[in-house]
Amino acid sequence: MPITNTDESLSAASAPLKPGAFLHEIFSDRARQFPERTAVSDAARTLSYAQLDALSTKLAARLRDEGVTYGTRVGMYLPRSVDLVTSLLGILKAGGTYVPVDPQYPGKRVEHIVRDSELSLIIGDAANLPKISSLRVLALDELLSAPALQPAAQDTRIDPNNSTAYIIYTSGSTGEPKGVQVSHGNVSRLLESTQRAYGFNAQDVWSMFHSIGFDFSVWEIWGALAHGGQVAVVPYDISRSPAALRQWLADQRITVLSQTPSAFRGLDEADRGNTAPLALRYVVLGGEALPASVLRPWVERHGDQKPALINMYGITEATVHTTFKRVLAQDLETAAMVSLGKPLDGWRLHLLDANQAPVAAGTTGELYIEGAGVAQGYLNREALNVERFVELPGAVRAYRTGDLMTLESNGEYRYAGRCDEQLKISGFRIEPGEIEASLQTSPSVAAAHVGVHDYGDGDLRLVAYVVPGQGVDAWTEQARSEVAALMAENLPGYMRPSVYVPLAELPVTHHGKIDKQQLPSPAAGTALSGAADVKGLSEQEHFVLKVWSEDLGLKNIGVNDDFFDSGGTSLALIRSLSKLKTHYKINLDPGILADGATAKVLADHITRSLVQAH
């Protein structure tokens, strides 16, 4: 397998990376090289490189007709699909910058992205978009049905390193998400650097599993297209079902799979009962700290050679990935957490103290990232740019991550926490200040603090400690429901608190900071829509509620209460299904809750399965 030996530094004495290149030109080169190979597929259709090249070129011409020129920002309000890949290529070929807007985002977040990025054009479905007077919505099929025109040639004087390819919005500490501007050169050099480490080829089939609003998708799309490989779009329903995903990976002959450790836990569970042969060459893990326990069962079944297991650390502001660690079986026996490995070629890491001086060897310091991946900066956030995109001695531009690291004697980096309040859940970096600001827009909340609680096995959930505006006694079920509804309007699902804990006041230290040691257990909170009534329940309903309440901490959840609205998470659901499968000795999959994530729906399915089994 053409993969870098982990005993060798990826960055020391390596040849310099090439100058940055335009992503659409890299794609067009592959289209000329592999015209008949499959470029992208979803559940409905497949396009070859020649077909995708022709369609995206036609779209670029039509976008030029609509006024798109160099630097124009164009939104994409599309689900993962062939159309999405066609659209982003067309935008880039027209000279524009694509701004992904996940259709799963609540309306107010969509409105903020449109306003902050000053979008005037967006490709998507007008029926599902919030009505914004300044925004023209372009339907892809209508654009492509018009006569094709020859787009203007790319201005060769433009430097790919200064040309923004996309803007992805991440959580912001001031209460509003912030847009990260990433150049063509940032991404093209990421692709070159990771190619040195991996050795991708035109036979690779990459799964596109992640939301276009999460920068893992940049890697999944361009990693395939840059090397003549195939982007295989994971259908949404399959992406929510580990068992269905495991079968899909086998059916589609996927060779490159990217997962957060949280998602991989579910896939590993599903893999234990599925012997369909896999074509996987690489499983790339990132977005969260990686406990060794997540990989041990997989390695016991599959070994550590094929697929190769890779742990990568990265951040949106440094273009997806920064480090590389080939994980071997012995790594899982020597430490509880897998190391982050060494920097990619073209990236350089600095561990500095509060005065931006290097820390002593083996000492924890704040990570600053230098090199090819450092993004252009935040859109419309000049003060934050000065704070985070800094100049180190020697006129070196670097990104100040806020992540604490230690450098081990073998040259590998280990994560040691945060030096600020930022949280990380399911691969998403979350600024609790944004959630707290949203909470305090409610008249029911006078003050708030948001933290995270581990319910076991990596099941991390957001906890909101709230000071009710009219006192603790006024924190009724109705008040909680109204606040939760407000959060659903303002925040994406991964940023909504699972539990609300009412307090008379927030405990503070002598220095006026939140005293986290004095915050009560989330068990004191209200995650639920009402007290459970266990009268008249079937044995299956009673046992499901028992698992959800006692094992997952969803106290008093009712038989008809929605699991996710009651504070449950995808990982918690997988944990509960695993216990129920063991107890009843039947197969259970998250997909059975597609029509309602309630204990009644799940218990009814269990009852039917038990009847069929006998």
From Swiss-Prot:
Gene3D superfamilies: 3.30.300.30, ACP-like, N-terminal domain of ligase-like. Pfam families: AMP-binding, AMP-binding_C, PP-binding. It catalyses: holo-[peptidyl-carrier protein] + L-threonine + ATP = L-threonyl-[peptidyl-carrier protein] + AMP + diphosphate. Keywords: Ligase, Phosphopantetheine, Phosphoprotein. Its EC number is 6.2.1.70. InterPro entries: AA_adenyl_dom (IPR010071), ACP-like_sf (IPR036736), AMP-bd_C (IPR025110), AMP-bd_C_sf (IPR045851), AMP-binding_CS (IPR020845), AMP-dep_synth/lig_dom (IPR000873), ANL_N_sf (IPR042099), PP-bd_ACP (IPR009081). One of its GO terms (cellular component) is cytosol. Belongs to the ATP-dependent AMP-binding enzyme family. This is Syringomycin synthase SyrB1. The lineage of its organism: Bacteria, Pseudomonadati, Pseudomonadota, Gammaproteobacteria, Pseudomonadales. The gene is syrB1.
